[in-house]
C-alpha cells in the first residue's frame, strides 16, 4: 500500500509518503535498522539465512524464545514463535515459505502487554487517538503461530505510559520520514526497558480498529 500511495502522490504532486519512507515501512529489517540509527527502542533483531543462525542469535542474546518472520509480509503471514526445544528447521522453512524476497528476520521475544496504535501526523506533529490493548487469550490452539483475537479500547495503560507510547510513536514516524499521513504502530511493553516498537506501517490497521473501534470509543469520526 505505501508504495502505491507514494507513486500516486509523486505523479500528482500530492502530499504522501516518499519512496524511501515506503521502502522502510514495508521491509522489516530496513525499518528496524533505521530505528536503531535514530535511537528508537526496538527488540533485538537480525537476519538469518539458516536454522543454525537462529541458535547463534539465541546464544548471543541469551534467550530461549524468539520470533521469526519474513521481512516483506504483513497480516502475520509467516510469523511463528520459537520456543527452547522447537524444531528450528521447521520454523525457518515456515517463515521462508511465506517470504517473497527470501529474507528472514529473527527477533527476541519480549514478554509483556502489547499495544496497537493508530496515529495521524500533520506537519510532523503526531496525534494518536487509537491506543488499544491487544488480546491473545484462548489462542493456544494455534501455537506457535501467533493469532491476535481482539483488543480493548480505551487502553488500560497508565497516563504516564500512554504519554511515553505517544512520544515513541511520533519519534518512530519521524525516523521513517512520515511528516503528513498516518501510521499504525505495534508496541510491546518491556518491564525492564519500557515501550518498544515491534513494527510500524505507513497506513492504518486492517479490520475494524481504525474504522470502528476508535470512532466508537472517542465519539469522533476521524
Residue ranges and their predicted role:
Residues 1-27, 39-49:
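A short, GP-enriched loop/loop-strand-helix hinge that lies immediately N-terminal to
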Residues 2-5, 54, 114-115:
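Short, well-ordered alpha-helical microsegments
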Residues 5-9, 80, 119:
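Short amphipathic alpha-helical segments
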Residues 15, 72-76, 206-207:
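A short, flexible beta-alpha/helix-coil linker loop
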Residues 27-105, 110-111, 122-124, 152-167, ...:
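Active-site nucleotide/adenylate-binding loops and adjacent lid/helix of ATP-dependent enzymes
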Residues 86, 108-111, 115, 119-178, ...:
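ATP-dependent carboxylate/phosphate-activation module, predominantly the ATP-grasp catalytic core
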Residues 193-195:
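Conserved protein kinase catalytic/activation segment
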Residues 197-199:
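Pre-DFG segment of protein kinase catalytic domains
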Amino acid at each position: 500500500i505505501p508504495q502505491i500511495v507514494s507513486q500516486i502522490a509523486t505523479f500528482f504532486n500530492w502530499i504522501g509518503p516518499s519512496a524511501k519512507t515506503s521502502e522502510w515501512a514495508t521491509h522489516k529489517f530496513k525499518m528496524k535498522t533505521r530505528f536503531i540509527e535514530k535511537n528508537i527502542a526496538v527488540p533485538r533483531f537480525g537476519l538469518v539465512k539458516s536454522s543454525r543462525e537462529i541458535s547463534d542469535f539465541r546464544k548471543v542474546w541469551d534467550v530461549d524464545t524468539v520470533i521469526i518472520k519474513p521481512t516483506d509480509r504483513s497480516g502475520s503471514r509467516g510469523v511463528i514463535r520459537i520456543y527452547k526445544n522447537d524444531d528450528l528447521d521447521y520454523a525457518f522453512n515456515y517463515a521462508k515459505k511465506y517470504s517473497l524476497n527470501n529474507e528472514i528476520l529473527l527477533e527476541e521475544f519480549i514478554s509483556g502487554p502489547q499495544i496497537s496504535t493508530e496515529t495521524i501526523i500533520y506537519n510532523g506533529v503526531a496525534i494518536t487517538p487509537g491506543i488499544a490493548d491487544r488480546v491473545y487469550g484462548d489462542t493456544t490452539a494455534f501455537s506457535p503461530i501467533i493469532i491476535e483475537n481482539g483488543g480493548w479500547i480505551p487502553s488500560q495503560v497508565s497516563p504516564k505510559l500512554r504519554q511515553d507510547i505517544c512520544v515513541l510513536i511520533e519519534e518512530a514516524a519521524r525516523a521513517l520520514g512520515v511528516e503528513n499521513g498516518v501510521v499504525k504502530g505495534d508496541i510491546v511493553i518491556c518491564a525492564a526497558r519500557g515501550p518498544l516498537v515491534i513494527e510500524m506501517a505507513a497506513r492504518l490497521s486492517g479490520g475494524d480498529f481504525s474504522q470502528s473501534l476508535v470512532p466508537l470509543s472517542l465519539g469522533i469520526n476521524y
